[in-house]
Regions:
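Short hydrophobic targeting helices and cationic amphipathic motifs
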Residues: 6-9, 13-16
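Methionine residue identity
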Residues: 1-3
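Short, surface-exposed loop or secondary-structure junction motifs
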Residues: 134-326
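Short, conserved catalytic-motif segment at the N-terminal edge
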Residues: 39-95, 117, 133-140
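Extracellular/periplasmic catalytic domains that process cell-envelope and extracellular macromolecules
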Residues: 55-57, 88, 119, 168-173, ...
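Active-site SXXK
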Residues: 49, 69, 96-124, 237-245
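C-terminal motif of bacterial Sec signal peptides marking the signal peptidase cleavage site
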Residues: 30-31
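Sec-dependent signal peptide recognition
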Residues: 18-23
């Protein structure tokens, strides 16, 4: 949901995250200055969380805070029983963690850098030669699409519609660091530029059989800007995951297990579901209030969610993981 361009929902999420951050800072400060965590009014904190269920901005929430030893110092959950009638929400509930997958993928990349397998200034084409000749899209006037999108006046009128796009050659080398910093030029189908978004949606990237097919489809699409020119949120970390795979000869799923979850004995973070894993429904805030998502409503790159099946062989480093709080 954080990838949708929904102003009302964004306001809810920003305010929610501010309040949760305040809670986290309070607990962090207390735990650093005392041998025991002091909670003077747990009900007041619970009420703060519940408010986001009651006002319709969230379908469910789980807040789980731990100290540095891994002991929980606060936990609370709530849900909209009409939207989630049959599932209990607790530390063992499996969530699609969406863009939090990016942190895991980047951590693996930095681990590979430490091992001398990757360098941050390596060209991406060293590992993904299919992207060496990728093109760059401009507005029909030949100006930058990122500049067009970031101009608020362009959201209010179709007078300066940038379509049809002008396609030019890539002028700079794309690097691994640019993938990490979202400066490589990739995007989601949420730019608001129909001729750009529709091209990505038609490719249905999430329906690729594996990362090779994903790259084959992606390489036909233009970048939204020259690599290194501006940061723009999108599929950059997903491509970074493929770099990790190509550099090691292992799948991203294997890399997560070998370098993170198994050494650290983490059981609640993975790609594919287990046999008995039940995922929560997918929700949308398209109407400025949370509800069950309609088919294709979260259409950020074609099919609106990655595959989570046991036999899935496509691992999205930017969107595809599932996890629990515990």
């Amino acid at each position: 949901m954080n990838m949708l361009n929904l102003n009302g929902l964004k306001i809810y999420q920003i305010n929610f995250m501010k309040n949760i951050l305040i809670i986290a800072i309070i607990f962090f400060t207390l735990s650093c200055n005392s041998n025991k965590t002091i909670i003077k009014d747990k009900k007041a904190i619970d009420s703060l969380v519940t408010n986001y269920i009651d006002n319709g901005s969230q379908a469910l929430l789980l807040v789980w805070l731990e100290d540095k030893k891994g002991n929980y110092i606060y936990k609370f959950s709530d849900k909209n029983n009409n939207l989630v009638p049959n599932q209990n929400i607790n530390e063992n509930t499996w969530f699609r963690i969406w863009s939090m997958s990016k942190i895991v993928t980047i951590s693996i990349t930095m681990d590979l850098v430490e091992d001398g397998i990757l360098k941050l200034d390596d060209p991406v084409s060293k590992y993904i030669p299919e992207l060496d000749n990728i093109k760059v899209a401009l507005t029909k006037k030949g100006t930058s699409l990122t500049s067009y999108i970031q101009n608020p006046e362009n959201d209010k009128s179709n007078i300066d519609n940038p379509c049809p796009l002008k396609i030019i050659d890539k002028k700079s080398e794309m690097t691994i660091l640019q993938l990490i910093n979202h400066q490589a030029g990739f995007y989601y189908a949420t730019t608001g530029i129909d001729c750009l978004d529709n091209g990505l949606i038609i490719k249905n990237l999430a329906d690729s059989k594996n990362s090779n097919e994903f790259i084959e489809r992606l390489s036909d699409l233009p970048l939204i800007d020259q690599p290194g020119n501006k940061d723009f949120y999108g599929l950059n970390t997903t491509v970074l995951g493929v770099v990790n795979e190509r550099a090691t000869g292992k799948t991203l799923d294997e890399l997560v297990k070998n370098r993170i979850t198994e050494p650290m004995k983490i059981k609640g973070l993975q790609y594919n579901k287990n046999v008995n894993t039940e995922l929560l429904p997918v929700f949308s805030g398209a109407d400025s209030i949370i509800r069950l998502a309609n088919q294709g409503e979260l259409d950020i790159m074609g099919k609106y969610v990655p595959g989570y099946g046991i036999d899935n062989e496509l691992f999205f480093g930017g969107e595809g993981m599932i996890g629990t709080a515990n």
